[in-house]
C-alpha cells in the first residue's frame, strides 16, 4: 500500500535449538535463551516447537517472563519435541501489534515453517508491493513477513527449503540474520555483508544451537562453535543429525558488521566474531584515555553498557574508577522504548547519582555512545 512505512527494528534476538539426543525440554531451553537475549528486544517475544514435524508456537507483546507464564510454557512442553525457535523483538512505535511478533509460522502445500529475523531490509517496501500485486495478503507491517512470503513462494516452486532460501537471498537487500525451522531442519542464515551477528553452538548430548549472541548458548549449556559466516546458510538436519554449510552467497568483499553490536547492543559476556564484547568496550575506553587525557579525580560509567569503557579509561589513565550511578534493575533499556517521552520518564527512575562518589570532585563520565542523549 502506498502509505506503508516500515519501522526500524535493528535490535532483535533470534534463537534455535536442535536436540539430537532427545533429552532437552526444548521449549524450556528456548525460554532460558530468550531470557538471556531480553536486552535485544522488549516489545514482544515468541517460541515455536517442532513435535515430529508438527510446528506449534506462542507469541505475544511483552517481556519473556510476562508472555510465557508457567501455563503457557507448559502447553509447549512436549517430550517428543526435538527442535525449537525463539525471538525477542524491538521496534519503534506504530508497529506494536501482535501480528508482528515472532516466530512467524507459515503453513503451505509443502509443509510448515517457523521463521525468526533480526535486521532490517532496505528494499522491503518494493518487495511487498511486488508480492501484493501477485495476490499476497499481509497480516502485519514487518519486513519479516515479506521474507516469509518469498521463501514460501520459492519453496512451492523449487525442491528444497535450502534452495528456496538461497533464491530468496538473491533479492533481499539490507540486514538479516534468520533462524528457520522446518519439519526436519533447523537453518541459520546471515546476510552477505554480515550486518547482524549469528553464532553456532553444540549441545553436550548432541545437537546444535543458533543464536544472536553466545550468552544465549551459555544459558542452555551449549558450547560456542563458531560464527555463521556472512552469506552462509547453515543446516542442522534432523534426518542425518549432521550440520552442513551452503556458501553460494559467501565471499562478498564488503562485509561489515554493525559496530553498535560491540558498543551497545550485545551483552558484555558475549563473544562475537571471536572477540569478547567486554574486552572490546574496555579497549575503547583505553583508546579514549590515550586520545583525550584529562586531570580528574574519578572515572564513572553510565550503566550498563558504559561501565566497561569507563573501566578501560580508568586503567589506562590511572584515575580511580568509582560507582557514580545506581541503576534500577527493573527499568529496561531506554533506547529501545517506543517514544522519547517514555524514554525521558524512564530515565528519571532508571539512574540515581551516588553523591559520595562525585560530590566536589572532577569527574570523567563515560558512556558507550550518544544516540538521543537521554541515557
What is the predicted role of each segment?
Residues 299, 306-313, 317, 321, ...:
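Extended, hydrophobic alpha-helical segments in both membrane/secreted and soluble proteins
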Residues 318-364, 374:
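Short, glycine/charge-rich flexible loops or terminal/linker lids adjacent to PRPP-binding catalytic cores
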Residues 136, 157-158, 293-297, 315-322, ...:
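Secondary-structure transition/capping motifs at alpha-helix termini
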Residues 175-176, 195, 205, 230-231, ...:
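Active-site lining segments that contact anionic ligands and/or coordinate catalytic metals
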Residues 146-159, 311, 315-333:
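Amphipathic alpha-helical
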Residues 1-230, 235-238, 242-296, 302:
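Conserved short alpha-helical segments that host acidic/polar catalytic motifs at enzyme active sites
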Residues 50-53, 183-185, 301-309, 316, ...:
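A glycine-rich phosphate-binding loop feature that marks nucleotide/adenosyl-phosphate handling sites
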Residues 81-86, 184, 214, 218-219, ...:
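Hydrophobic transmembrane alpha-helix bundles
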Amino acid at each position: 500500500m502506498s502509505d506503508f512505512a516500515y519501522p526500524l527494528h535493528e535490535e532483535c534476538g533470534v534463537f534455535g535449538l536442535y536436540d539430537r539426543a532427545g533429552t532437552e525440554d526444548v521449549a524450556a531451553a528456548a525460554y532460558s535463551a530468550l531470557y538471556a537475549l531480553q536486552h535485544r528486544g522488549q516489545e514482544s517475544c515468541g517460541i515455536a516447537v517442532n513435535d515430529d514435524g508438527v510446528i506449534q508456537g506462542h507469541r505475544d507483546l511483552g517481556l519473556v517472563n510476562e508472555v510465557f507464564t508457567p501455563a503457557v510454557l507448559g502447553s509447549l512442553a512436549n517430550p517428543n519435541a526435538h527442535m525449537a525457535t525463539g525471538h525477542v523483538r524491538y521496534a519503534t512505535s506504530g508497529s506494536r501489534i501482535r501480528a508482528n511478533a515472532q516466530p512467524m509460522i507459515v503453513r503451505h502445500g509443502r509443509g510448515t515453517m517457523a521463521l525468526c529475523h533480526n535486521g532490517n531490509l532496505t528494499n522491503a517496501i518494493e518487495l511487498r508491493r511486488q508480492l501484493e500485486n501477485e495476490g499476497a495478503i499481509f497480516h502485519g507491517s514487518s519486513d519479516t513477513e515479506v521474507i516469509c512470503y518469498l521463501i514460501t513462494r520459492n519453496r512451492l516452486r523449487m525442491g528444497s527449503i535450502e534452495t528456496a532460501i538461497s533464491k530468496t537471498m538473491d533479492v533481499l537487500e539490507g540486514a538479516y540474520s534468520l533462524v528457520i525451522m522446518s519439519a526436519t531442519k533447523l537453518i541459520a542464515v546471515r546476510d552477505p555483508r554480515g550486518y547482524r551477528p549469528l553464532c553456532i553452538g553444540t549441545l553436550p548430548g548432541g545437537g546444535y544451537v543458533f543464536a544472536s549472541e553466545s550468552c544465549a548458548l551459555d544459558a542452555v549449556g551449549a558450547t560456542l562453535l563458531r560464527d555463521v559466516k556472512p552469506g552462509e546458510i547453515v543446516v542442522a538436519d534432523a534426518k542425518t543429525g549432521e550440520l552442513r554449510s551452503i556458501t553460494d552467497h559467501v565471499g562478498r568483499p564488503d562485509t561489515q558488521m554493525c559496530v553498535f553490536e560491540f558498543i551497545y547492543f550485545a551483552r558484555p559476556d558475549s563473544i562475537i566474531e571471536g572477540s569478547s564484547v567486554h574486552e572490546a568496550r574496555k579497549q575503547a575506553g583505553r583508546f579514549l584515555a590515550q586520545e583525550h587525557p584529562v586531570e580528574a579525580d574519578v572515572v564513572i560509567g553510565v550503566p550498563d553498557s558504559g561501565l566497561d569503557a569507563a573501566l578501560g579509561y580508568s586503567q589506562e589513565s590511572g584515575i580511580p574508577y568509582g560507582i557514580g550511578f545506581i541503576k534500577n534493575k527493573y527499568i529496561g533499556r531506554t533506547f529501545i522504548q517506543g517514544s522519547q517521552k517514555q524514554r525521558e520518564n524512564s530515565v528519571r527512575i532508571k539512574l540515581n547519582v551516588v553523591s559520595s562518589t562525585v560530590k566536589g570532585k572532577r569527574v570523567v563520565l563515560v558512556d558507550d555512545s550518544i544516540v538521543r542523549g537521554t541515557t
